[in-house]
């Protein structure tokens, strides 16, 4: 009898968690805003403009895109690397857009999270001072490396030094500001993170020109949005919002022309909401994708605005972040 009672309680708990997982869209619509977890100190991806009080960046724009798809406002919550996953798990935020790497562990049933399509393909690297004459990882035997806790970079760093049979001394800090700050005042020989983050943080150094990013890439770091596991409706909305920005770039639909774009191409017409009932399949208005592009632009426009020559100046041509038609991995499934 006792065993039956325990099983019954466990089943009720599973059902309860499943029911909670299915209500994100309804909650967002009721409150009139989507709550997005972001980085507040990473220019180009997520940063707070102290002059305006507004968040800006590549990840921030994807939060705005999700809100535009639904027709609600946004609220941005700044999170450290250590806080981000818990904030999503506990329902503090609706979606996490904070330069977070897709890994098996993070995507497993243990954490209860799901990754949406990758928005930026990255890799871990190193930033060093020019004066130290370090040209590659091979020159770092016995180096002291600053790293942020709660990230994939800790494990990748240990693996890379072990693979190259190098001695390693690490200094681990709770957040990016502290870890990069320690490096910037010569508290360690180098700092390691995703290369996009290194490019961003270099702009915040006391003397940016004193630092170089080494050519070594020691990992694959696919970055993109995360949602809670079990809410398929919300997962689909976030997933296809990302795909909408990919599709729009491929077909020349921009922030400036989205509202008036016309075509005889059946797939484009489905995208624009002119036929096919695609919006209803997601529980959204038929012109939801038009609203997304009108709000933030297509993938290329978002990239150019924050990561292009006037932003972090991370080359896109020939990279994995180019469209699939140009040799990259930015690719939208069939819009049908």
Go through each PLM region and give its residues.
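Extended ligand-binding regions for polar small-molecule ligands
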Residues: 61-64, 68-69, 131-134, 138, ...
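Bilobed "Venus flytrap"/periplasmic-binding protein-like clamshell domains
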Residues: 35-44, 52-69, 122-178
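Acidic, polar ligand-binding/catalytic clefts
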Residues: 60, 64, 68, 73-139, ...
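Positively charged n-region of N-terminal signal peptides that target proteins for export
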Residues: 1-4
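Bacterial N-terminal signal peptides
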Residues: 8-16
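C-terminal functional modules
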Residues: 274-336
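Sec-exported extracytoplasmic/periplasmic mature domains
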Residues: 29-30, 67-75, 89-93, 101, ...
């Amino acid at each position: 009898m006792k065993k039956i009672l325990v099983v019954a309680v466990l089943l009720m708990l599973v059902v309860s968690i499943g029911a909670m997982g299915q209500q994100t869209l309804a909650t967002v619509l009721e409150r009139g805003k989507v709550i997005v977890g972001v980085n507040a100190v990473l220019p180009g991806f997520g940063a707070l403009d102290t002059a305006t009080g507004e968040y800006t960046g590549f990840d921030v724009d994807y939060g705005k895109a999700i809100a535009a798809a639904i027709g609600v406002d946004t609220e941005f919550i700044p999170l450290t690397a250590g806080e981000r996953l818990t904030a999503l798990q506990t329902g503090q935020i609706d979606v996490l857009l904070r330069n977070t790497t897709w890994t098996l562990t993070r995507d497993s049933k243990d954490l209860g999270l799901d990754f949406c399509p990758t928005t930026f393909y990255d890799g871990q690297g190193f930033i060093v001072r020019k004066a130290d004459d370090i040209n590659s990882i091979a020159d770092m035997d016995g180096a002291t490396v600053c790293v942020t806790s709660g990230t994939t970079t800790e494990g990748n760093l240990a693996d890379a030094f072990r693979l190259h049979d190098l001695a390693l001394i690490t200094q681990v800090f709770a957040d990016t500001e502290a870890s990069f700050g320690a490096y910037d005042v010569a508290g360690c020989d180098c700092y390691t993170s995703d290369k996009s983050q290194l490019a961003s943080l270099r702009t915040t150094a006391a003397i940016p020109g004193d630092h170089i990013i080494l050519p070594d890439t020691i990992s694959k770091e696919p970055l993109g949005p995360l949602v809670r596991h079990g809410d398929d409706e919300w997962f689909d909305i976030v997933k296809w919002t990302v795909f909408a920005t990919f599709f729009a770039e491929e077909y020349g639909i921009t922030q400036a022309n989205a509202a008036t774009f016309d075509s005889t191409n059946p797939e484009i017409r489905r995208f624009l909401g002119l036929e096919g009932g695609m919006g209803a399949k997601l529980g959204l208005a038929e012109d939801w994708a038009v609203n997304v592009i009108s709000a933030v632009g297509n993938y290329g426009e978002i990239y150019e605005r924050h990561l292009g020559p006037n932003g972090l100046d991370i080359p896109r041509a020939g990279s994995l972040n180019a469209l699939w038609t140009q040799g990259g991995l930015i690719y939208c499934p069939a819009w049908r």
